[in-house]
């Protein structure tokens, strides 16, 4: 499991999916 992952990217993807 990667703890230091690009959280910003994950958040952006989530927001993009919800907004889309």
Swiss-Prot record:
Entry protein name: Unknown protein NF019 from 2D-PAGE
Note: On the 2D-gel the determined pI of this protein is: 7.2, its MW is: 92.4 kDa.
Provenance organism: Naegleria fowleri
